[in-house]
Amino acid sequence: MTASIDLSSYRDQHFKGSRSEQERSLRDSTTLYVGNLSFYTTEEQIHELFSRCGDVRIIVMGLDKYKKTPCGFCFVEYYTRAEAEAAMRFVNGTRLDDRLIRVDWDAGFVEGRQYGRGKTGGQVRDEYRTDYDAGRGGYGKLLSQKIAPNTDNR
């Protein structure tokens, strides 16, 4: 394998199975995790970019588990490993919607994984962010809740 398609150190902590089963699934997978997306990036934009590397089988948009709105990630599944490897080589680190996107191997989409795992429904990484990021909903959600004006005082 070349460096651009090697497995990263990230592992899904909710994977159902042993570490060796997860490693095997990642090495055989045709599914990619795509992160650092703008909340406004559409499935059509993702399809247009990733279809340059092969036939996309399915795209599953990551959603806020409470609002059911996009929350900055998705899964892209190809028909073959070679197509997924091409996306790892050529799409990882490219710009989409003015953001550098991150592409990583995924062991395969399982229903329920399309929802953010953070306390407020989105991604954990967006809950504690202290910088303002217009493409990802402004300030971090937990910080926004702390500084939101109290409108109940009359």
Swiss-Prot record:
Query: Where does the record place the RRM domain?
Result: 30-108
Instruction: Identify one Gene Ontology CC term for this UniProt entry.
Output: nuclear cap binding complex
Q: Which GO terms describe its biological process?
A: mRNA cis splicing, via spliceosome; regulatory ncRNA-mediated gene silencing
The domain of life for this entry's organism is: Eukaryota
Query: Pfam family of this protein, just one?
Result: RRM_1
CDD domains for this protein: RRM_NCBP2 (cd12240)
- Keywords carried by this UniProt record: mRNA processing, mRNA splicing, Nucleus, RNA-binding, RNA-mediated gene silencing
Entry-linked Gene3D superfamilies: 3.30.70.330
Which InterPro entries would you find in this protein's record?
NCBP2, NCBP2_RRM, Nucleotide-bd_a/b_plait_sf, RBD_domain_sf, RRM_dom
Q: Show the GO MF annotations.
A: RNA cap binding
Chain sites annotated for binding mRNA:
10, 33, 102-106, 113-117, 123-124
Q: What subcellular compartments does it reside in?
A: Nucleus
Q: What does this protein do?
A: Component of the cap-binding complex (CBC), which binds co-transcriptionally to the 5' cap of pre-mRNAs and is involved in various processes such as pre-mRNA splicing and RNA-mediated gene silencing (RNAi). The CBC complex is involved in miRNA-mediated RNA interference via its interaction with Ars2 and is required for primary microRNAs (miRNAs) processing. Also involved in innate immunity via the short interfering RNAs (siRNAs) processing machinery by restricting the viral RNA production.
How this chain assembles, per its entry, is: Component of the nuclear cap-binding complex (CBC), a heterodimer composed of Cbp80 and Cbp20 that interacts with m7GpppG-capped RNA. Interacts with Ars2.
Q: According to its UniProt record, which protein family does this protein belong to?
A: Belongs to the RRM NCBP2 family.
Please give the name of this protein.
Nuclear cap-binding protein subunit 2B
Native source species? Drosophila virilis
